[in-house]
Amino acid sequence: YVITGADDVFALSVDTGAILWQYAAKLDPGLTSICCGWTSRGVGLGDGKIFAGMLDGRIVALGARTGKELWSVQAERWQEGFSLTCAPLYYDGMVITGFSGAEIGVRGRVKAFDADDGKLLWTFYTIPGPGERGHDSWPQDNEVWMHGGATVWHTPAVDPELGLIYFSTGNPGPDFNGAVRAGDNLFSASIVALEARTGKYRWHFQEVHHDIWDYDAPNPVVLFDAEIDGRVRKGLAQVGKTGWAYILDRETGKPLIGIDERPVPQEPRQATAATQPYPKGDAIVPQHVEIAPEGYELVNQGRIFTPFVGDKGVIASPSLYGGANWPPSSYDPVRRFLFVCASDVAGNFIGGDRDFTIPPDGQHYEGGVVGFAPLPRTGIFAAVDVRTNTLAWRYRWPDQCYSGSLATAGGLVFVGRNDGRLTALDSDSGLKLWEFHTGAGMNAPTTTFERDGKQYVVALSAGNLLIGSAR
């Protein structure tokens, strides 16, 4: 099953590639308020149905064999800034999804619907309201929390044994203006666990307090079991734009590998947090700038968490375009390796204004701007050993890494390149074994399946406008 960036859904024959059926999304023709490109990150499958999220805020259920629309619900209104870009999760008769739109001033949420008829079952707000856990991490003298972001870009993961779902959240809003939202701004830039049946909060871990850099957590969480410190632990890993892997106990939310709170540089006009979490182990991407670009002066050596304010740009690395972004990571349960596609991209940050006003619904709500620093922008593909949070290997590419990866039991890991190459690497060493040029940007994750005793690899290549890959 394939879904396009415009939400048309196709069923293809695994034997011939022929189209068996197709569903036209018929998006609202007035649709305008989309952040970060027309895209869909897949469909959900369960109970003989395909579940697809639409950019205009609908969820539709289709017959898996026929493509016939079985039900459709308006889960959120695009006119208010919401869109649906993740693949819905089917679990135990429910369809569970998050929503995009933090850059357009929405209040993040996750919803569960009945898979039979689309009836709403529960809602969890990722920005807590008055009287809810975490509301005190937002200002009490304004209503900025109502537009606080923390949207959920990717499909939640589920542990059926524990009955929990897990997801990571986006930036607080406005993105680059901390002056109007003093506090840690929960549950933005966080990993959150909920009870799947009820949506009840279980635990959270915040990766970035009071984020002013758009260092959110768009990469989907990965669940794993591994021996750490002499016993098998139920683990969870998430790789942020910070360039770190955050490795937690998925039962409790506590770090499995140490994470220290360290003091960071301060800028009172941005109400910056006093400390930030620093995971022990290796960063996947550089977190400082070696040499200032011509015509620029570096503040704090351009290190991660360097604050900024006003119209004079401040260079810091990584930027919101660096670290790990939307393309999903993959996990090898034999080697205990997490394979991560990331980018080494520094940014030039501008923002922070106490007089910032909330724009009307559906308009961009960022409170600043970040451009590319005049430095090389390169890609990194790496293997992280989840038992130690250290790099097993890492390779740098001349172009940004923007592709989901696939780990296989045969000791191969597959990843795409922006110029259209599908690359097979040795899982142990990262050495390239073979490549195939697909003709368009290989940005979607590769899929594998077995048919008649033979294993196949399927690659969807179409390019990506946001990253500027071949189309």
Q: Where are these predicted regions, by residue range?
A:
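Blade-level signature of beta-propeller repeat domains, shared across WD40, Kelch, NHL, RCC1
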Residues: 444-471
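Beta-propeller blade signature
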Residues: 62, 66, 108-120, 181-199, ...
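Structural signal for beta-propeller blades
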Residues: 9-10, 59, 110, 191, ...
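Residue position within the beta-strands of beta-propeller blades
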Residues: 2, 52, 96-97, 167, ...
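A detector of repeated loop/turn-to-beta-strand junctions in beta-rich toroidal repeat architectures
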Residues: 6, 56, 106-109, 187-188, ...
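Loop/turn-rich, solvent-exposed surfaces of beta-rich toroidal or solenoidal domains
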Residues: 225, 342-344, 373-431
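Extracytoplasmic beta-rich repeat domains
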Residues: 19-44, 69-87, 104, 125-157, ...
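Short coil/turn segments that connect the beta-strands within blades of beta-propeller domains
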Residues: 47-48, 92-94, 161-163, 233-234, ...
